[in-house]
Amino acid sequence: MILGIDASTYLDELAHGAKYFDGNVPIDPLDAFHANGVDCMRIRVWNDPRSPDGEPYLAGDCDMDHYIRLGKLAKAKGYRLLLDFHYSDFWADPGKQMIPKAWQGMDVDALCDAVYTYTKDCLTAARAADVAPDFVQVGNEITNGILWPVGKLTLEDGTRGNYDAFCRLLAAGCRACREVLPKAEIILHLEKSNDQAVYREFFTQMETHGMDYDIIGASYYPYWHGTPEELFANLDACRSFGMRIMVMELGYGFTDRPYRLDGGEKRLVIDADRSYVPGFTEKYPMTPAGQADFVRDFLTAARSHGVDGVFYWEPLWIPGEGICWASPAGQKYIGEEGKSTENEWANQCLFDYEGRKLPAFDAYTL
């Protein structure tokens, strides 16, 4: 089983002076992960993560130049690479798939050309820089489509449809990948990983439309995606499609206490107020020991179900001055203005708020 991490914000952490420790001893976290058997780095790519005036959207400034820099660092340490195309200028997920600024106003034909050309150019640049990815993710958490509204799968009346346009867009990215990097494995990544009906519908449509891909990818966060048993029942059912299966994003908290910065407490996505995640069944306490038990049990179950890979999402995204999930400009682009501009995911890391390695770090091993 492949064990990986998505550490897309790592260069941003280093630029802001982040330090990581085993006890009181400074460590290089990428070396430490690799020693535990982690050997694949997932790196997200946004088209143009800046406002028209040039203000960065932050959260790592993850454009293609960033991919090349982080990819070179990871490859030098023995990591394979996974390039995660969002096909957006900033965060793309089930609740938002914003068309890049440069592509707005295009119809489906023009968007297909844009996706193909952009994908081909990025992968050609990666190959020229000697950081060609071993895996390419064509879209991020695309359960509800990509490039909204043109490629949206959730319709205004609440039903699902529009697969013809969606599949044309997706196929353009897959075709570019096959042409530039024929040996790279193509991943289609969804969330809602406890919903067998959605996965059956989606991947049946991929068969119907002749989609060229290799791996079914799923996100799993127990706050939103049910129990591990529901996840693995769904992944087992997906074996009927004949593809490899990976968990592309995984996370669990080591605390529900907010961190303090500038003398004030900072908001977290998952904190002591569980009303935000009403369906969450807390089998594991959000403590260092509970997080370690979750990670250990999850990997044991993944192996027993024949999962081909697991990636922990942003295990190094510790809090610090200048570290945030979105600038005001980034929030404006995705329509989420007025929110905090801090790091709201810091309690899901495998290092604590001071950068000390947590017990779950050593549980995350082959």
Where do the model's predicted regions map?
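Soluble or luminal CAZymes and related metallo-dependent hydrolases
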Residues: 24-25, 62-66, 110-118, 162-169, ...
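Acidic-and-aromatic substrate-binding clefts and catalytic sites of carbohydrate-active enzymes
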Residues: 13-24, 48-65, 143-146, 191-200, ...
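Short aromatic-enriched loop/helix-cap "lid" or pocket-rim segments at secondary-structure transitions
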Residues: 16-18, 93-96, 148-151, 199-201, ...
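Aromatic-rich peripheral "rim/lid" segments of glycoside hydrolase catalytic domains that contact
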Residues: 154-156, 233, 237, 255-272, ...
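Boundary/entry segment of secreted carbohydrate-active catalytic domains
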Residues: 1-32
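Substrate-binding cleft and catalytic face of glycoside hydrolase catalytic domains
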Residues: 32-185, 191
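Glycoside hydrolase catalytic-domain groove-lining segments
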Residues: 27-34, 164, 175, 179-185, ...
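Hydrophobic faces of well-ordered beta-strands that scaffold small-molecule active sites
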Residues: 3-7, 39-43, 81-85, 134-138, ...
